[in-house]
């Protein structure tokens, strides 16, 4: 066993979005930066390896296959295998490029191994039998979050209960799939596998699927996934999971309290992710954590150890790659700028569920706006009824709804819910308008390209009506 010591101006633990961007920016100033990553399969972070990029690649291929009309099992299996190959090539190329970009900085060093704090100023890196002690003026914790399996009796012991990470690696595709959790990840994977003919059953504990959206939007979304062959049960409580010889049984209580059984080939659990702090040695530092296990930070993302910052999912903020990127901007402002940026600056952060069509949202729902005391107008229209938006028809995606919640006194957009093809692009324009106080009338009267989904804003926003 060998032990060495190195010192850097900055050490980043975890090769994710915020950390890698910060490491590159810091190294470009001539500072010595170390990037510590425990797995070469995670260069670039969760997003490009097991998260956003590979899953959206699978969503894309699944949508293509569904549209092809080839629904026999042989074609479905071949298409799924092809999608997996495409995904792996894509993530492999992005992984290599991320390493290349980091190491193109002369003062940046990639260190493979597991990092564990010895104190506020020292980290021990272990790789096999080798150990390295690294000291730094500044540490960045960027370890992300990991999928968890809840303490359902039998679930953690089961060989057929998988996380989203594990399900992505599963080949051939299952013929029957149960999904526990009806949030964005659960809905996304339900859509992927149902497109290839897998019999998918979604179990959601909340009273209604898509319950955080307004009723009209939620109902439209539920109808769409039902028509795609996805069976969804809300208001359920999963009791036990039991492995069989070549299947797994989920025992649950339905919304009426009746005992039900679901037998499938595999179960994916999508009930949440937890901050990845295990094994970091936080007990050896002055870093405090929240009641949910996240690293506690202030509005500048500084931990309770003044020389240590935490970026991305590990700090308990919204678990989005683009939030991690903004975390980088906040910390860079502290280290190399005027210190003016903070997490308090964030407004109108959008999100998308990648179902087919995608469901994108930002700001307040109608329900939330009324509860907050706003006097509002609502502009809403089914996609099929928007005459001035032929783009949806040319793409053969005429289903969905576009809805806006508007402050009746100021004409400011308070929120939007867009269940429509390409909504993940349009929602960014809406969020930008909200952040910069552009009114609904200004968005309504703007000139947009044709045919596009964006031009639907002309027609939808022209039909705002008061709501009491």
What are these regions (language model features)?
Residues 14-17, 180-183, 213, 313:
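Glycine-rich Rossmann-fold phosphate-binding loop(s) that bind the pyrophosphate
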Residues 19, 183-186, 324:
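Catalytic nucleophile loop
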Residues 157-173, 261-338:
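FAD-site-proximal beta/loop scaffold in flavoenzymes
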Residues 213-220, 311-370, 445, 450-468:
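A conserved FAD-binding loop/helix module that cradles the flavin
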Residues 2-8, 17, 25-31, 36-173, ...:
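Glycine-rich flavin
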Residues 13-41, 46, 53, 57-58, ...:
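Flexible, glycine-rich terminal cap/loop adjacent to redox cofactors
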Residues 52, 141-199, 231-232, 283-285, ...:
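Glycine-rich dinucleotide-binding loop and its adjacent helix/turn
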């Amino acid at each position: 066993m060998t032990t060495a010591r190195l010192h850097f101006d900055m050490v980043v633990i975890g090769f994710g979005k915020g950390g890698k961007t910060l490491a590159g920016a810091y190294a470009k100033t001539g500072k010595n930066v170390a990037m510590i990553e425990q797995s070469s399969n995670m260069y670039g972070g969760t997003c490009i390896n097991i998260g956003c990029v590979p899953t959206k690649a699978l969503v894309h291929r699944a949508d293509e296959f569904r549209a092809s009309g080839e629904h026999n099992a042989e074609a479905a299996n071949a298409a799924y295998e092809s999608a997996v190959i495409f995904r792996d090539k894509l993530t492999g190329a992005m992984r290599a490029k991320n390493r290349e970009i980091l190491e193109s900085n002369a003062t940046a060093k990639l260190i493979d191994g597991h990092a564990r704090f010895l104190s506020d100023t020292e980290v021990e890196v272990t790789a096999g039998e080798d150990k390295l002690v690294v000291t730094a003026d500044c540490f960045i914790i960027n370890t992300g979050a990991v999928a968890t399996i809840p303490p359902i009796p039998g679930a953690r012991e089961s060989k057929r209960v998988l996380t989203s990470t594990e399900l992505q690696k599963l080949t051939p595709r299952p013929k029957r799939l149960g999904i526990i959790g009806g949030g964005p990840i659960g809905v996304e994977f339900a859509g992927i596998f149902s497109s290839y003919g897998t019999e998918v059953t979604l179990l959601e504990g909340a009273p209604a699927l898509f319950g955080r959206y307004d009723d009209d939007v939620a109902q439209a979304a539920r109808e769409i996934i039902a028509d795609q062959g996805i069976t969804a049960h809300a208001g359920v409580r999963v009791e036990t999971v039991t492995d069989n010889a070549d299947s797994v049984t989920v025992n649950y209580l339905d919304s009426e309290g009746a005992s039900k059984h679901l037998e499938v080939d595999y179960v994916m659990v999508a009930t949440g992710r937890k901050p990845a702090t295990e094994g970091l040695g936080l007990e050896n530092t002055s870093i405090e954590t929240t009641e949910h296990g996240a690293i506690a930070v202030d509005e500048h993302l500084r931990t309770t150890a003044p020389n240590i910052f935490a970026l991305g999912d590990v700090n308990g903020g919204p678990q989005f790659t683009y939030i991690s990127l903004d975390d980088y901007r906040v910390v860079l402002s502290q280290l190399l700028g005027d210190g003016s940026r903070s997490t308090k600056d964030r407004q109108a952060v959008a999100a998308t569920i990648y179902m087919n069509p995608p469901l994108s949202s930002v700001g307040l729902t109608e329900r939330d706006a009324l509860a907050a005391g706003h006097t509002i107008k609502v502009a809403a229209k089914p996609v099929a009824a928007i005459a001035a938006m032929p783009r949806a028809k040319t793409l053969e995606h005429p289903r969905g709804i576009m809805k806006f919640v508007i402050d009746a006194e100021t004409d400011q957009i308070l929120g939007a819910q867009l269940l429509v093809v390409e909504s993940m692009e349009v929602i960014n324009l809406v969020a930008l308008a909200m952040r910069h106080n552009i009114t609904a009338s200004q968005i309504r009267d703007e000139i947009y390209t044709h045919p596009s989904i964006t031009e639907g804003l002309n027609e939808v926003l022209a039909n705002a009506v008061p709501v009491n």
